[in-house]
Amino acid sequence: MTILRKSHPLLKMVNHAFIDLPAPSNISGWWNFGSLLGLCLIIQIASGLFLAMHYTSDTISAFSSVAHICRDVNYGWLIRYIHANGASLFFMCLYLHIGRGIYYGSYMYKETWNIGIMLLFLTMATAFMGYVLPWGQMSFWGATVITNLLSAIPYVGTNLVEWIWGGFSVDKATLTRFFAFHFILPFIIAATAMVHLLFLHETGSNNPLGIPSDSDKIPFHPYYTFKDFLGVIIILASFLTFVLFFPDLLGDPDNYSPANPLNTPPHIKPEWYFLFAYAILRSIPNKLGGVIALVLSILVLALFPLLHTANQRSMMFRPISQFLFWTLVSDLFILTWIGGQPVEPPFIIIGQIASILYFSIILVLLPIAGLIENKILKW
C-alpha cells in the first residue's frame, strides 16, 4: 500500500497533501479551522443538494416549497436547519481562521492570504444569495436593500442594479438567477480552496512562534489527522446539539412571513455574520461613502502584509500588538451588536466610533505598535 500511495498519480497528490506532508511540530488547536472549513463546505454542499431537489425558484411557490420541505419531506426539517445553521458555523470558523491568521502573522504568505480573501468574498456572496431563496420578508427586503447599494456607483449604478434584478424590482428573474448562482458558487469555492491549499503547501504551514520550522517537522498523518478528527467530533457534536435544540435562534422571525413588496419590516438587517459590515455601511451618512467603507472593511485585510512593520512575525511575544488585536476583536463584537440595532441615538454615534476604531487599529495603530516593539527589543 505504501508503494501505491507514493507511486499512483492520483494517490500521490493526496499523499503529499494529507499523509506525508511535513508539518510544524508545535501547531495548536487554532490550526484546526482549515479542516473544519472543509467540513462546513461538505455539509453545505450535501444538505444544499438535497434541498435543491425539492425547492422551486419561483416567487409564487418558493416560500411554500420551503414549508413543504419542512413538513412533507422525510427529515426535510433537519436538512433545512442543518443548511441554515451550517452557514453560521461556516462563518464562525471562517472568522476564527482569519483571526488566527492575523494573530500569528500567517498573512505573510501573500498568495495564500489573498486567495483566502477571495474565498471570503465568494462565501459572503453565496450566503447573501442563499438568504434570499426562502422568499420571506427579510429575504425580499434584504435583497432589495443590499442590491440597491450598487446604484451608488456613479453613472452606471442604476443600469447595473436593473441588470442584476432582471427588471425594475426584485422579482422572479432575480430569484431564479440567485438560485442558479447560489448552486454553482460552492463548487467554485471548493476549487478556489484547492488553490488556497496548493499555495499553502508551497511554503508549508506557519506556527505559533512565527519562526521557520524546517528543522523540526513531523508527518501530517497520524499526528494532525487525529488532531483534526478530534476537532471535527467536537464541532459536529456542538453543531447538532444547536440544530436540534435551538434551530431558529440565529434566524429572523420576519422570514416566516411570505415576501410582501407592499409591507416593509420595521428593521431590515442581515444575518449575524454580516452585521459588523452592515454597521460600518450605516455609520457613514453618504450612500457611496457607505458602500466604499463596506467593501474596504473586508478588502483592508489585503493590506496586512504591507502594513507589517514588526521584526517578529507572530504576536505571541508582542504585548502592545496583542492588546490592539483583542481591542479589534472587541470592536467587531460592538459593530455586530450595533448592526442589529435601529438607526437612532445612542447607536448611531457608537457605530461611528466603532467604525473609526476598526480602520484606525488596522491601518495606523498596529503598524505603529510593531515599530515601538522593534525599539523595545533593541533596548
UniProtKB/Swiss-Prot annotation:
Cofactor requirements of the protein: heme b
Taxonomic source organism: Chaetodipus californicus
Name this protein carries in UniProt: Cytochrome b
Transmembrane segments: 33-53, 77-98, 113-133, 178-198, 226-246, 288-308, 320-340, 347-367
Localization per Swiss-Prot or TrEMBL: Mitochondrion inner membrane
Pfam families, A to Z: Cytochrom_B_C (PF00032), Cytochrome_B (PF00033)
GO annotation terms (biological process): mitochondrial electron transport, ubiquinol to cytochrome c
Keywords (A to Z) from UniProt: Electron transport, Heme, Iron, Membrane, Metal-binding, Mitochondrion, Mitochondrion inner membrane, Respiratory chain, Transmembrane, Transmembrane helix, Transport, Ubiquinone
